[in-house]
């Protein structure tokens, strides 16, 4: 199955997206690193503009997602009934912090998605651990957008193993 995800950074792009058949509209501050958070105001505006669209939001670039500001943002975005929240897994040292937020936050109907980075502390052994903690899905991305692609960074064996999980 092929699906189309389009990242948007502002309300003007959301208006354009409203005229096109897009499977998932991803709210992302592209000027703020790999998973820049657009802010709750834009999340609210886009949800009002596109109430029937499938929306995802990147939740920022915190190494430790279990911090007061991120938890506050997560809860506000969940209250807006966004379909998917993308939370970055930037550092293996913070694996247990992901478990804490997944257990402590009521995600209601919002699905938390863990974003692992092929070019930053990637460890295939963590995929099953992250799913067991409560992530609804795992995706692989690149953290440094001007570096190599996922196909350059991971072996075919790693990609096949990831797809089997």
Feature-to-residue mapping (PLM):
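Hydrophobic faces of well-ordered beta-strands that scaffold small-molecule active sites
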Residues: 4-8, 25-27, 55-61, 83-87, ...
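Alpha-helical scaffold elements within enzyme catalytic domains, especially in hydrolases
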Residues: 16, 49, 76, 104, ...
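Conserved, mostly hydrophobic/aromatic
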Residues: 17, 46, 138
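Catalytic cores of alpha/beta
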Residues: 9-20, 59-80, 119-133
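Active-site-adjacent beta->alpha loops and helix N-cap segments on the catalytic face
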Residues: 31-51, 65-70, 89-109, 120-125, ...
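Glycine-enriched alpha-helix->loop->beta-strand junction motifs that scaffold or abut catalytic
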Residues: 20-25, 50-52, 78-84, 106-111, ...
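N-terminal-biased segments
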Residues: 23-34, 114-132, 136-144
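N-terminal entry module detector
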Residues: 1-31
């Amino acid at each position: 199955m092929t699906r189309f995800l389009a990242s948007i950074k502002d309300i003007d792009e959301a208006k354009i997206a409203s005229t096109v058949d897009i499977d998932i509209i991803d709210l992302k501050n592209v000027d703020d690193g790999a998973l820049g958070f657009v802010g709750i105001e834009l999340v609210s505006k886009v949800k009002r503009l596109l109430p029937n669209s499938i929306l995802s939001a990147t939740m920022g670039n915190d190494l430790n997602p279990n911090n007061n500001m991120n938890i506050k943002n997560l809860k506000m975005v969940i209250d807006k009934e966004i379909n998917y929240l993308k939370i970055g897994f930037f550092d293996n040292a913070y694996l247990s912090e992901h478990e804490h937020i997944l257990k402590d936050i009521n995600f209601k109907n919002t699905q938390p998605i863990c974003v692992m980075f092929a070019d930053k502390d990637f460890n295939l052994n963590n995929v099953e651990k992250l799913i067991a903690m409560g992530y609804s899905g795992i995706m692989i991305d690149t953290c440094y957008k001007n570096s190599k692609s996922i196909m350059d960074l991971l072996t075919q064996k790693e990609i096949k193993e990831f797809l089997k999980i």
